[in-house]
Swiss-Prot record:
Name of the protein this chain belongs to: Glycogen synthase
Species of origin: Lachnoclostridium phytofermentans (strain ATCC 700394 / DSM 18823 / ISDg) (Clostridium phytofermentans)
Pathway given in the UniProt record: Glycan biosynthesis; glycogen biosynthesis
Known role: Synthesizes alpha-1,4-glucan chains using ADP-glucose.
Family, as annotated: Belongs to the glycosyltransferase 1 family. Bacterial/plant glycogen synthase subfamily.
NCBIfam families: glgA, PRK00654.1-1
EC number annotated for this UniProt entry: 2.4.1.21
Pfam family, one: Glyco_transf_5
């Protein structure tokens, strides 16, 4: 039986800021327990809700050197849904009301986490065959493993996998500070290792020293070898392309199930959605103060309101989107520019636009269930989970052809009656607007055809089962 250790900065249900937490919290449940002993290690943030902290049990503690610093390392544990979770405790690094702070704080925080993870393994009497690292916050794990820990026989032969959820975020800070924090020698700060334009890059270190690299979709794995999407690391990704693959994320089909969803007004399934789904639309219209109109084309957006997600395209044609027979519901927070944009239009067209400038898991479920279409015009999208959730709920995605959206949404072809959503290729506001109008035309004038699109989308399997089998094959190969 192979032993696998997930190392990450967040995981549902304990702490979440984005889709990384969904992946780390869901994937281990679907790995075959007969062949793999899989465990997860996370920071014990002060911001983790009390309901979870009360269930954690003290396991051990020790003191660890981080260069000239001597730091306390506590380890707590909790078994959730059959998976053992370990929590690295240190009030200096993990205090505060949110998991991430300024980059200069996080650089030291996650260097501490990476070294503490490796240091605690003999104390826990758990020697993983593979350490599976997620994003830049864990990028130093393979680096430390290659450096000082190789002097200890316990660590010999441990393999590492680096999963890139978003190459844009790399954990870059000045070399001198990182050297002071990590005590890594000058050997590690060359252009073929951690150094990037004179600074130190945590994610680059993880990519260089990992045994294998994965991204969260096939298309994104190809995209990041190109300059436009490579975020300055495209050369490195090409150099390591023989150890790089894309595995599409899944979603938790137990949580995202319209037939048994406790958050939605009227449960439904692939057989009865034609009659029952509309009841969720009516309920959400009433809840949000929108016009009660069954024929209105209701579009949902659940997103961080940032440039990466294509909000500038929506800004360009917002007036056109807010047509008489269209309703738009937004859920999320982000840049002031976009928050204020949606607030403005919600005031201007109060019966057609609802701006919910916050995040609520319950509200997101209601939007997936109630809306007719779901808009994701991303500039780039490593994988994307929202389109998978919308397909699961029979809400037709309208997406730009990039990254994981290419791999998961099949473009509608009216001549062949195929496809699960509507797509557009170029990052262009009017091309997006044309696609929205085309989707609305099918919805309003060809309802039988629209329902067939929903049928095909709801029949797709984007659960973690398929993705988990691919990860199992990768684990076995290392």
């Amino acid at each position: 039986m192979k032993k696998i250790l997930f190392v990450a900065s967040e995981s549902v249900p304990f702490i979440k800021t984005d889709g990384l937490a969904d992946v780390v919290g869901s994937l281990p449940k679907y790995i075959n327990k007969n062949n793999f002993d899989i465990r997860v290690i996370l920071p014990n943030y002060m911001s983790i809700p009390r309901q979870w902290k009360e269930k954690m049990l003290y396991r051990t503690h020790f003191y660890m050197n981080l260069n000239w610093r001597t730091q306390y390392v506590g380890v707590l544990e909790y078994q959730y849904e059959g998976i053992w979770y370990y929590f690295i405790d240190n009030e200096f690094y993990f205090a505060g009301n949110k998991p991430y702070g300024n980059i200069y704080e996080d650089i030291e925080k996650f260097a501490f986490l990476s070294k503490a993870v490796l240091t605690c393994l003999p104390v826990l009497d758990f020697r993983p065959d593979i350490i599976h690292c997620h994003d830049w916050q864990t990028g130093l794990v393979p680096v430390f493993l290659h450096d000082s820990f190789q002097k200890n026989e316990f660590y010999h032969g441990i393999k590492t996998i680096m999963t890139i959820h978003n190459l844009k975020f790399q954990g870059v800070w000045d070399k001198k500070t990182v050297q002071d924090i990590t005590a890594l020698s000058e050997y590690y700060f060359s252009p073929d290792k951690l150094e990037t334009y004179g600074d130190a890059n945590y994610l680059k270190g993880g990519i260089v020293f990992s045994d294998y690299i994965t991204t969260v979709s096939d298309t994104y794995a190809h995209d990041i070898t190109m300059p436009f999407y490579g975020e300055g690391l495209d050369g490195l990704m090409r150099a390591r392309s023989d150890c790089l693959c894309g595995i599409v994320n899944g979603i938790d089909y137990e949580e995202y199930n319209p037939e048994f969803d406790p958050f939605i007004n009227k449960p439904y399934n692939a057989k009865n959605f034609r009659k029952e789904k509309i009841k969720n639309k009516r309920a959400l219209q009433q809840e949000l103060g929108l016009a009660k109109d069954d024929k209105a084309f209701m579009i949902g957006i659940v997103s961080r309101l940032i440039d990466q997600n294509g909000l500038d395209l929506i800004d360009c044609v917002m007036e056109d989107i807010c047509a008489e027979d269209t309703q738009l519901i937004i859920l999320g927070t982000g840049k002031d520019r976009y928050e204020n944009l949606f607030r403005h239009y919600a005031r201007k067209y109060s019966s057609r636009v609802s701006a919910n400038i916050f995040y609520s898991n319950e509200q997101s479920h209601k939007i997936y269930a109630a809306c007719d279409a779901f808009l994701m015009p991303s500039l780039f999208e490593p994988c994307g989970l929202s389109q998978l959730m919308s397909l699961r709920y029979g809400t037709v995605p309208i997406v730009r052809e990039t990254g994981g959206l290419v791999d998961t949404v099949e473009p509608y072809n009216q001549h062949e009656s195929t496809g699960t959503g509507f797509t557009f290729k170029n990052y262009n506001a009017h091309e997006m607007l044309y696609t929205i109008r085309f989707a609305k035309e099918i919805y309003q004038d060809k309802k039988r055809e629209w329902n067939k699109i929903i049928d095909r989308g709801m029949a797709k399997d984007f659960s973690w089962k398929t993705s988990a089998r691919k990860y199992e094959e990768l684990y076995e190969s290392l």
